[in-house]
Amino acid sequence: MGCGGTLFYPLLITLSVALITYNIIISANAPLKQGFPGRSSSSDISIDPVIELPRGGGSRNNDGKRIRLFHTAVTASDSVYNTWQCRVMYYWFKKIQASAGPGSEMGGFTRILHSGKPDQYMDEIPTFVAQPLPSGMDQGYVVLNRPWAFVQWLQQTDIKEDYILMSEPDHIIVKPIPNLAKDGLGAAFPFFYIEPKKYEKVLRKYYPEVRGPVTNIDPIGNSPVIVGKDALKKIAPTWMNVSLAMKKDPEADKAFGWVLEMYAYAVSSALHGVSNILHKDFMIQPPWDIEVGDKYIIHYTYGCDYDMKGKLTYGKIGEWRFDKRSYDSKPPPRNLTMPPPGVSQSVVTLVKMINEATANIPNWGS
């Protein structure tokens, strides 16, 4: 290969960054008019008509306080693994929304299904069908479909609410969520493993020094985030392009690994001048967080392993365990065994909530 091989990757990265810069300029001046490269028309993209009608962009309650509604959106594939989580998530969304009363700021709900075709749960969960990335473009990193799915949904759907909550299938809402965004700022959960300062050298390819200090990049992913709809319409195309460029960049891909798409969102939000209020009380992540407390969401991303005395055995399969990954090819059964005495309240609550959902969702396990 010689010199040509040596220059190929730097040249590819340079071109990718140039494309990102171009898209930032375009999206800042003409939000969401661009489509995915290579697609001649948005008419090729199927839209599922079964979408819950939102309750409106905003209103006032009896006290005269303005209700700033947000629409909850969850991206998912059509895998068994994603599907059972979405069914549980939507069950609790409906129940918590109903319990909140007329002053709730929780508006409509959409599952953004990036499989490219409808599935059997279209009537159960309000769903928009998005096209996946062209074959091979995700390079085995299926999460890259998330920003592209959001671009399609924002472009093709009449969303009545003025704000969007980006959530995930493995989120369970435990109490009514208010609109935490304000004054042009988004609201987001800070992740300890998103460290812009540590990776400044890599991030400067995508967030140049002229844009300001690297600390302008918040330590967040795209979820959970509440952000203005108009702001997200600008951020989403940039998020898509930065994600794809980072995945093609060996240095960025190695540095960020499985959280690459999270860094891409944080960078894109900063590029468009959208800072975020960091809310540690947005969610908990059992088993590390032991109490639900005043948090809004349980995120069950980690496995929960305990011995029969209630002692955590993380890193070792426990005598009692709950790990969503145990149910990648079939849904968890109804009436999961409750954890033994001594297990943290957060884990007990998680299992109780999953059991309630599966007991009440029709045709569970079908």
UniProtKB/Swiss-Prot annotation:
<dbReference type="InterPro" id="IPR044845">
    <property type="entry name" value="HPAT/SRGT1-like"/>
</dbReference>
<protein>
    <recommendedName>
        <fullName>Hydroxyproline O-arabinosyltransferase 1</fullName>
        <ecNumber>2.4.2.58</ecNumber>
    </recommendedName>
</protein>
<keyword id="KW-0333">Golgi apparatus</keyword>
<keyword id="KW-0808">Transferase</keyword>
<keyword id="KW-0735">Signal-anchor</keyword>
<dbReference type="InterPro" id="IPR056508">
    <property type="entry name" value="HPAT-like"/>
</dbReference>
<keyword id="KW-0812">Transmembrane</keyword>
<comment type="function">
    <text>Glycosyltransferase involved in the O-arabinosylation of several proteins including extensins and small signaling peptides. Catalyzes the transfer of the initial L-arabinose to the hydroxyl group of Hyp residues. Contributes redundantly with HPAT2 and HPAT3 to arabinosylation of EXT3.</text>
</comment>
<feature type="transmembrane region" description="Helical; Signal-anchor">
    <location>
        <begin position="6"/>
        <end position="26"/>
    </location>
</feature>
<dbReference type="GO" id="GO:0005886">
    <property type="term" value="C:plasma membrane"/>
</dbReference>
<dbReference type="GO" id="GO:0005802">
    <property type="term" value="C:trans-Golgi network"/>
</dbReference>
<dbReference type="GO" id="GO:0005794">
    <property type="term" value="C:Golgi apparatus"/>
</dbReference>
<keyword id="KW-0472">Membrane</keyword>
<dbReference type="Pfam" id="PF23452">
    <property type="entry name" value="HPAT"/>
</dbReference>
<dbReference type="GO" id="GO:1990585">
    <property type="term" value="F:hydroxyproline O-arabinosyltransferase activity"/>
</dbReference>
<dbReference type="GO" id="GO:0005768">
    <property type="term" value="C:endosome"/>
</dbReference>
<keyword id="KW-0328">Glycosyltransferase</keyword>
<dbReference type="GO" id="GO:0009536">
    <property type="term" value="C:plastid"/>
</dbReference>
<keyword id="KW-1133">Transmembrane helix</keyword>
<dbReference type="GO" id="GO:0000325">
    <property type="term" value="C:plant-type vacuole"/>
</dbReference>
<dbReference type="GO" id="GO:0005797">
    <property type="term" value="C:Golgi medial cisterna"/>
</dbReference>
<dbReference type="GO" id="GO:0005801">
    <property type="term" value="C:cis-Golgi network"/>
</dbReference>
